[in-house]
């Protein structure tokens, strides 16, 4: 059984995605041998009240090995209450979208929310980007600041962080990597990257497909065969044990 740390379902407002409905996504994941992971609602990322979409997703995933990575905008006045509500409902993680919502990773409200997530034992997923910036002619995404992301992790040392969909060219800016920061493989699918890079040990990466905005099968194809089990399952177990 494999684990996907960056799974999505729902509607992407800027173009139509194939097989974005939850039932379709779960079917495709099963066909790829992926039976568990963090599932995020694309709809929630754009709702004024993201819990309207996330609450529905929690109910739909009940009884499965999938957990919801809920959307929270730390700049909203009800962000902390929303986080407590999600914890009570059984979500598995918090996904932040500074790339969409326009706040800096060093915003005091972000730090405060992430510290609360640590107390609640909820991992925080920081989304570096949703898609290639060259495709973003309908909106202007905020580019990630790797230095600020590292500082955020250091300020919230009791919180586990997962950086999602960063680029291979951005990895060096994360060094030295904070002990509580992991990366998913979305955006890093450069042929030979995991075999050739020496800066971050392979146990600090979790598999992330970023489907349906990216392809599940191609996400798996460039993973080294001798590290696939580690990246797609074993590292997730270590991540949860921390």
Residue ranges of each PLM-predicted region?
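Mid-to-C-terminal alpha-helical segments outside catalytic/metal-binding sites
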Residues: 1-9, 13-36, 84-85, 202-204, ...
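Hydrophobic faces of well-ordered beta-strands that scaffold small-molecule active sites
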Residues: 3-7, 37-40, 66-70, 92-96, ...
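Active-site environment of divalent metal-dependent phosphoester hydrolases
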Residues: 10-12, 44-47, 75-78, 101, ...
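Surface-exposed cleft-lining segments at the edges of enzyme active sites
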Residues: 11-14, 42-46, 92-105, 130-140, ...
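Active-site gating/metal-coordination segments in enzymes
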Residues: 35, 48-126, 130-131
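Distinct, well-ordered alpha-helical segments
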Residues: 50-55, 78-87, 106-107, 135-155, ...
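H/E-rich (His + Asp/Glu) clusters that bind or coordinate divalent metals
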Residues: 160-242
């Amino acid at each position: 059984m494999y684990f996907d740390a960056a799974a999505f379902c729902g509607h992407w407002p800027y173009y139509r995605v194939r097989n974005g409905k939850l039932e379709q996504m779960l079917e495709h994941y099963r066909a790829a041998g992926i039976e568990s992971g963090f599932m995020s609602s694309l709809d929630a990322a754009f709702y004024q009240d993201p819990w309207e979409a996330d609450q529905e997703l929690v109910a739909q995933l009940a009884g499965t090995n999938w957990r919801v990575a809920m959307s929270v905008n730390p700049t909203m006045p009800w962000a902390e209450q929303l986080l407590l509500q999600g914890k009570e409902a059984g979500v598995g993680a918090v996904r932040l979208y500074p790339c969409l919502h326009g706040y800096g990773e060093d915003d005091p409200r972000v730090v405060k929310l992430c510290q609360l997530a640590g107390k609640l034992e909820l991992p925080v997923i920081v989304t570096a980007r949703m898609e290639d910036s060259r495709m973003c002619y309908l909106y202007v995404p905020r580019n990630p600041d790797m230095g600020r992301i590292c500082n955020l992790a250091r300020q919230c040392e009791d919180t586990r962080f997962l950086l999602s969909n960063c680029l291979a060219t951005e990895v060096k800016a994360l060094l030295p990597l904070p002990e509580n920061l992991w990366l998913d493989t979305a955006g890093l699918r450069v042929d030979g990257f995991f075999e050739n890079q020496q800066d971050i040990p392979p146990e600090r990466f979790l598999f992330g497909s970023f489907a349906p905005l990216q392809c599940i099968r191609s996400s798996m194809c460039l993973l080294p065969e001798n590290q696939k089990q580690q990246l797609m399952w074993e590292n997730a177990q270590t991540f949860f044990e921390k």
